[in-house]
Amino acid sequence: MSGGKLNAEQQVRNEFNQWAAEGKGEEMEAHHISITEQTLAMMSLKPGERVLDLGCGTGWTSRMMAKAVANGDQPGQVVGLDVADEMIRRARAGSVDHDNVMFVVGSALEIPWEENHFDKVLSVESFYYYADQDRALAELFRVLAPKGELYILINLYRDNHYSLRWVEELKIPVQVRTEQEYVEMLKRHTYEDVRAVRVPDLTPTPEEYSGRWFKNAEELRDFKRIGALLLIARKPDIEVPPPAYQVY
């Protein structure tokens, strides 16, 4: 990993550790619950499936998925992965009642898992923070099982002009692409059945808005109507060979 990308990842780790300390990780559930629930419905999670929650934060989505895959002859498992160790600490503390979910500190650029393992991968509101999105997609391809499904959900993308206001305000670098650019990127990595879906935020909008990101409630309502971008893709029916050597 290059020094620049490592430095960018360290910036992300530091920022989200700070978010965790300030309780912002828990706030994400309220902000993203609507678009996430709609995405989970499209994923059609089944008992026994193995799922990766990439950029899991405090683990609220991981716990939802753990319930969905729990029952069956062989209970499924959810792995939550996040670069911020404080987020992972909070995720573990909040998941003691879930036997089939585990949380790991790690990078999307070097996913600490074996090849061809996960039936499904979900990433909620984290993919645009990855300094090398191509490498992340290659890693996801590696750890997905043959015919495994990938779901990437993001609010920050160029086609939603309201979201571009965040770029200069964020303290860490982000990647900003159009829907079509993301679709083409997935296809370059030989994912199949690539498609993009807009997921509107169905939560009620207050009549008065006093936040910092929108001029008024009407802008917030329009932002929700445009919706988040959900990228869906499938790994072909092939296995990725393990590396030729291992370092112990």
Q: What are these model-derived regions, one by one?
A:
Residues 174-190:
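Short alpha-helix
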Residues 207-248:
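Core SAM-dependent methyltransferase catalytic element
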Residues 1-46, 60-64, 87-90, 94, ...:
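Conserved class I S-adenosyl-L-methionine
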Residues 52-110:
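Class I SAM-dependent methyltransferase SAM/SAH-binding core
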Residues 109-120:
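A short acidic, Gly/Pro-enriched loop at the edge of an enzyme's catalytic core
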Residues 148-154:
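Conserved beta-strand signature within the Rossmann-like core of class I S-adenosyl-L-methionine
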